[in-house]
From Swiss-Prot:
MF-aspect GO terms: pseudouridine synthase activity; RNA binding
Pfam families: PseudoU_synth_2 (PF00849)
Protein name stated in the entry: RNA pseudouridine synthase 5
Organism expressing this protein natively: Oryza sativa subsp. japonica (Rice)
EC number(s) on file: 5.4.99.-
Segments forming domain S4 RNA-binding: 64-114
The entry's keywords: Isomerase, RNA-binding
Keyword Transmembrane helix appears in the UniProt entry: no
A biological process from GO: enzyme-directed rRNA pseudouridine synthesis
Family: Belongs to the pseudouridine synthase RluA family.
Principal EC category: isomerase
SUPFAM superfamilies: Pseudouridine synthase
Reaction catalysis annotation: a uridine in RNA = a pseudouridine in RNA
Length: 397
């Protein structure tokens, strides 16, 4: 199988880093275009009346406090049936179409360049940098991997388009990586590949919840994912299997809840292998193979066994958030910054700083069924001493 790169993606003087076929990316504009939220008003009680401010302050209460929604309404950010509504006490009619336009804002810094590690007619594998979100959410609506995939001109031969009726206009990610996590991200070019790859990841999560021998689970999987991580403390055992369930807990600043170690959560399985014990720093370099793909699974599992990732701002020992008490925020300041949304002052899942890299994976190709391996080059801090020496030799150091 070939992994052909598009010729001339970048100038020769800007050659991609070792291990990459080519790089692409469009610099971010200073401000995004804002975003619109559309609702159709339905009255639960025919005898009751609901005002505009009541609707938004209850339906979107995690977005802003009551004064925040009053400000948005008076600033003309909401329309009702196509007309700007500036009266918070306006009575809503059944079936009214409500549109809230979140004003353009300057999103926090995020890298924009992506390295292509593998590419064929069905899928593409990217090396995602730390600090770049995969899909739009919260403050990051434009500065995402998905946006870069949409911005790139994916030139495909007409013969390919005619043969592949399921071809998509651009590749789409088929799994998650945390914003602070770097490394391998698989994206599908066709609807068939998307469905097949998504099924592989879902199958892993399902198998993690079954009482089966580890060897049987490994044989059943169509994809195996391996990460590198740097954790606090010295792990005594060379290998550790973690099976702590992961579920949602209440957490200020995260409306849908925060994923954490939770006895009532969903099954999750992580296999940890020690690579080096860095006793002078009281750190351990590890490889983690995940048999499921729960959100923030590695961060939670390592914290659960008493070895949080080095510099993880959110998860502490026990796999729980380090902070759980609400903090006062300045409504006026938050509106000025991001068009009306409050920035949580406490750490949230998207905050960076920890050292976690999706290093390599082996998968059954979604159309050929061939087993292939793809590797993302390691950051220096996540290399073993021997790997660092080998890298220095390659670079002529």
């Amino acid at each position: 199988m070939t992994a052909a790169a598009a010729a001339g993606e970048i100038p020769a003087e800007d050659a991609p880093p070792p291990g990459a076929l080519y790089s692409f990316g469009t610099p971010w504009p200073e401000f995004n275009e804002g975003i619109s939220y559309i609702d159709t008003f339905r009255c639960a009680d025919a005898g009751a009346t609901t005002t505009l401010i009541e609707f938004y302050s209850t339906s979107y209460k995690s977005s802003a406090p009551l004064p925040g929604w009053i400000k948005r309404i008076r600033d003309g950010q909401i329309t009702v049936d196509g007309e700007v509504a500036t009266d918070p006490d306006m009575i809503l009619r059944e079936g009214s179409k409500l549109v809230y336009h979140r004003l353009p804002w300057q999103e926090p810094f995020a890298p924009h360049l992506l390295d292509v590690l593998y590419e064929d007619d069905d899928m593409i594998a990217l090396n995602k940098p730390s600090g770049l979100q995969v899909l739009p959410k919260g403050l990051f609506q434009q500065r995402t991997v998905l946006a870069q995939l949409q911005l790139k001109d994916w030139k495909m031969p007409s013969s390919f388009c005619s043969k592949r009726k399921d071809a998509q206009s651009h590749p789409v990610p088929v799994h998650r990586l945390g914003r602070g996590t770097s490394g391998l991200l698989l994206c599908a070019k066709t609807k068939l590949a998307k469905a097949q790859l998504a099924a592989y990841f879902a199958e892993g999560a399902t198998n993690a919840g079954k009482s089966r021998d580890e060897t049987d689970i490994c044989k059943a999987r169509k994809i195996s994912k391996f990460y590198r991580a740097l954790v606090t403390g010295i792990l005594e055992n060379d290998e550790v299997m973690i099976t702590q369930p992961i579920g949602l807990v209440r957490y200020p600043g995260v409306a849908e809840g925060l994923y954490a170690a939770c006895s009532s959560g969903k099954p999750a399985m992580s296999k940890v292998r020690v690579l080096e014990r860095l006793k002078i720093h009281n750190h351990t370099l590890i490889q983690v193979e995940i048999h499921s793909g729960r959100p923030h699974q590695i961060r939670i599992h390592l914290a659960y066994i008493g070895h949080p990732l080095v510099d993880d701002p959110l998860y502490g020992i026990g796999g729980q958030p380090k902070f759980d008490e609400p903090e006062p925020t300045s409504t006026a300041d938050s509106f000025a910054y991001d068009g009306g949304y409050e920035r949580p002052l406490q750490p949230v899942p998207g905050d960076c700083g920890y050292h976690l890299h999706a290093h390599w994976l082996v998968l059954c190709h979604p159309t050929t069924n061939e087993m292939i391996k793809i590797t993302a080059p390691l950051p220096h801090i996540l290399q073993t001493r021997e790997e660092q020496q080998d890298t220095a030799k390659l670079l002529g150091g």
